Amino acid sequence: MKTMQGKGSGRRLRGALLVTMAASGAIGLAGCGGSNDNTTTTTPTNVKPSFVGTVTVTHFDGVSDDLLTAGLGAAGLASATAPTVANATAPTAAELRRLAIYNNYRALVDTNAKGGYGTLYGPNVDASGNVTSGSGMVPGVEYVAYSDDGSGQQNVVLLVQIPDAFDAANPCIITATSSGSRGIYGAISTGEWGLKRKCAVAYTDKGTRAGPHDLATDTVPLQDGTRTTRAAAGSKAQFAAPLTDTQLAAFNLATPNRLAFKHAHSQRNPEKDWGRFTLQAVQFAFWAINDKLSGGSAPNGSALAVRPDNTIVIASSVSNGGGAAIAAAEQDTTHLIDGVAVGEPGLNLPASANVQVQRGGVTLPVTGKPLFDYVSYANAFRLCAALSSSVSGAPTQSFFAGNIGWPASVQANRCAALHANGLLSSTTTAAQADEALQKMRTYGWEPESDLVHASMAYFEIDPSVATTFGNALARASVLDNLCNFSFAAVDTSFHPTTVNATALAQLASTGNGIPPTTGVQLINNLAQGGATQSKQSVDSSGTQAANLDGALCLRKLLTGADAASQALQLGISQTLRTGNLGGRPALIVQGRNDALLPVNHGARPYLGLNAQVDTSSKLSYIEVTNAQHFDGFIDLVPGYDTLFVPLVLYEQRALDAVYANLKNGTPLPPSQVVRTTPRGGTAGSAPAIAATNVPNFTNTPAVADRISVSVSGGVATVSVPN
C-alpha cells in the first residue's frame, strides 16, 4: 500500500474526484471505488477513455519475443549487428518493432560492457541491482492505440506494456514519454526500470515519431511503422502532411524529392500538449490494466483492481520526454501522478520566472532561456567555438581537421562569416574561435561542456533541433520551407535525390524523427548552385560556412515581427512551465557537462521556480559531474568513454528513490552535486567502469556538495557549488 507521505488528505481528495473524472472519461471509470473514510460507495466499471481509438493487444511470450528487448535479449541489444529484415523494402510490423526497440535502446544507453552494461545496468541486472545469468526478456502484453481529437490529424500513439509479473496487489505505473522526436519506443530505457519492478509502463510518442511523409511518392507511415499511400491510409496514417493534392503537386514540381516529418510539419505545435499526452497515456494504462486483469470483460458492479487511489504512478523519462513528465505533473488536476523522476529534462521557463543561478558564489549572467532561444544561439556560434585551441583535443574535432564528412576549413569559414556579420569582433581565426567559445559560456553553457561542443557541431545537432523546433513552434507547413530549409536524401553531389527505398521503409524504426537522420539530410534551398545539403552548401557570402544564413534566419524568429516570427513566439509561450508540482516528491537528475540542454537553462532555474510557487515542494535536484546528454555516444564517439560516466544509472537511481519514498516513506535525498570519476585511459579503449566511478547520491551530502535555494524579495537564488 502506498503511503503518499504528507498527502493523506490528498488521497481522500483523489477518491472523491474519481466520480467526476470517470463521468468525463478521464480515467476510464464510471464511478469511484470509495475514499479512505469509506463514506462513499459506488460501482466502478472499466470504460475506455473517449480519446482512445481502436486498440490492438499483443502478448509476447518472453522467449521468442518480449516487452523489453523484442526477443533479442541483453546480448542482442549489445550486438553491433542490427536485427535482420527478410524483405528490406517491405519490413513487417514485427520486424519494425524489433528494429525500433534495438535502435532506441542503443541510442539512449551505452551497451558496451566496459561502460557498465550488464554489470551496473541493463536487462540482465535485476531491480535490486543484482547481475543475473538471464537474458532480461520480459513476457507480457502490449496495448496500442491512437489518441485523436476527431480530426485524424493528431493520431498520437499510446502504448501500455503490462508484464505478466504485474503485481495487482502492489500496482504501479511508470510513464515513458518518448525522448527527442522519437517514436513510441523512444524511452524504452525508462520503461526497463518499470518492467523490472513489475510495473506497467505507459508510453506515448507525444505527437512526434520518425516515419516521414514522402512527398514525392505520397506515401505515409501507419501506426505500426509500415507504409502505404496517403489515400489508402486515410485517417489511419500516423502522419500525413496536411496538404491538398494541388498543393502537393505544385510543391513537388518546385522542390522535388522532399520529405515531411511529424514533429516539424504537423502544424500543431505538439510540444504544447506533451503533458496532456503523457496524462492520456496514464489514463489509457489504467484502462488497459483492468481490461487485462478482467480478461477483457468488466461487468457492471465489479470492483476495479487497479485505481488511482491504490496505484503508485511515477511520471518519468529523459530529455524532452522528461520535460513532458514534468508538464504532466504540473497539469495533473485529477491526481493521477504521485511522483516524478526524470533525467536531463527539457524545460522552457517563463521570462518572468525571477530566478538567478549562482555557481561558486558567482551569479551567472544568462540563465533560464527556452530551448529555441539557446539552441538557435548555439546554432550560430558552436561550430566556430569548437575550433578554439583550448578544446583542440575534444572528441570529433580531429574529424573536422581531416575533412571527414565536412568541407575543408568549414569551421574557420564560419568564424569569418560571423565576423563579417558583426557577431564576432576578433580578426584572426584563432581569436574568433576563442571569442565564440566565451560567448557560449556567457550564454549559459558551463566550462564542463567545452569538450562536448565539437561533437555537437559534428553531428549537426544544433541545426537539426533549431530547424525542427522552429517549424513546430511556428506551426509552419512543409510548403513554407521555413528559413529556406527542407529535408531530403542527397546524391554524391549533395543535391536532393530520391530517398533510398530501404531507408524509407525502415525509417520509422531507424530514425530519430529530427533530420539529419538515417539518410535524410538538412537542405539549404537557397544555396548557390541550387538546393544543397546544408552543411556542404555555399551561401550568399560565397563561402562554405555551413549555411550561416539559415542559422541567422532561425535566430531572428525570436525577435522578428513578421508572421512566422510571431507564430513562433506564440508557440514558445504555449510551452512554458509553471514550476508547480503540487507538492509531489520529485527528483531531477542531470549531467553538469550537458551541452544540448545546459543545466543553467533547465534544471537549475526550474529548482528556483519551483521553490517560489510550490509551497509544499518536495523537489530535489541531483547534478552529476562528468556526465552529458547522450549516453549512446559513450561507446560511439572515441574519447567519450574516457571522459563521461553513464547518466542512465542515476536516472534509474532517481526512480528507485521516488518509488521508495512513495511506497515506504523513505526520505528523498536533498539537492546535491554527485562527484564521479571518469574512466580515463585511451580514447576508444577506456578501462572498465567500477562502482567507485559512479557513487550514489546521499541523504547527507557534504556541505561542499549541497545545492541550495533561497527566496527573497520575489527572487529565487539557486546556489550550486563548484
UniProtKB/Swiss-Prot annotation:
InterPro entries: OHBut_olig_hydro_put (IPR016582). Participates in the degradation of poly-3-hydroxybutyrate (PHB). It works downstream of poly(3-hydroxybutyrate) depolymerase, hydrolyzing D(-)-3-hydroxybutyrate oligomers of various length (3HB-oligomers) into 3HB-monomers. It catalyses: (3R)-hydroxybutanoate dimer + H2O = 2 (R)-3-hydroxybutanoate + H(+). GO terms for cellular component: extracellular space. It is found in: Secreted. Belongs to the D-(-)-3-hydroxybutyrate oligomer hydrolase family. Inhibited by diisopropylfluorophosphate (DFP). The active site is at S319. Residues 1-25 form the signal peptide. Its main location: secreted. Pathway: Lipid metabolism; butanoate metabolism. GO terms for biological process: butyrate metabolic process. It comes from Ralstonia pickettii. This is D-(-)-3-hydroxybutyrate oligomer hydrolase. Coiled coil: none annotated. It comes from the Bacteria. The keyword Isomerase does not apply. HAMAP family: 3HBOH. Keywords: Hydrolase, Secreted, Signal. Optimum pH is 7-8.5. Its EC number is 3.1.1.22. It holds the Pfam family 3HBOH. One of its GO terms (molecular function) is hydroxybutyrate-dimer hydrolase activity.
